Amino acid sequence: GSKLWFNCNPDSSEHWFFKEWIDENSEKTAEKNRLHLHFTMDDNFSLSDEVKQRYDRMYSGVFYQRYIQGLWVLAEGLVYGAVFDKSRHIVKNYTPSNQAFYYISIDYGTLNPCSMGLWALEHGKAVRIKEYYYDGRRKNIQKTDEEYYSELEKLADGYNIQHVIVDPSASSFITTIKRHNKFRVRKANNSVIDGIRNTMTLIENDRIFICECCKDIIREFSLYRWDEKSI
């Protein structure tokens, strides 16, 4: 008879493929005449130790369990709880050098909070040195694009901004920024999973730091939880 071969990276333990083909406790799995082989990078003899170490550093948290250890695990609990260490990643009295490049990231929200961060990049590290945060839902007053643009200019005052990086879904706000012709706009990668994975890796490798004055992003890092139904 015919045979099926599958080769895949693990995902959530709630994934249909895991439940139907891999989970030893699943009735659907028990019905199949199948062989499950679990392997990791160490089983690939074509990879050098240097390459394996590089891949090993690329992931952390649940992504390390999935992509390096080959485990089908559920993303649960705090997103950055395992990697964000306040004693290590929060800095005091940080003064960027003359070689620093400056960027502003914007998580634009109408119903959700609007968060803007001024970042200093140097020596392969990014430090959030100032921020603007506004929660229209909590204050019961929504701001216009022009009002948010005014806050952007205040945040950028005194700095040579390379790019303003904005959520691409904030099309009206991007139009407002471009109309003023002061900042160069770069649209952010809107993939939630890629963004979380990259941020976790940068934090784990001590390449992202937060100044203690940026209390809102520090609070968000401490509260941000996985949506177990979607991840």
Language model region names:
Residues 23-32, 86, 91-95, 199-203:
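Short, conserved catalytic or adaptor-binding loops enriched in Gly and charged residues
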Residues 37-39, 68, 188:
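Hydrophobic residues at beta-strand termini and immediately following loops
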Residues 44-106:
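ATPase catalytic-site recognition across NTP-hydrolyzing enzymes
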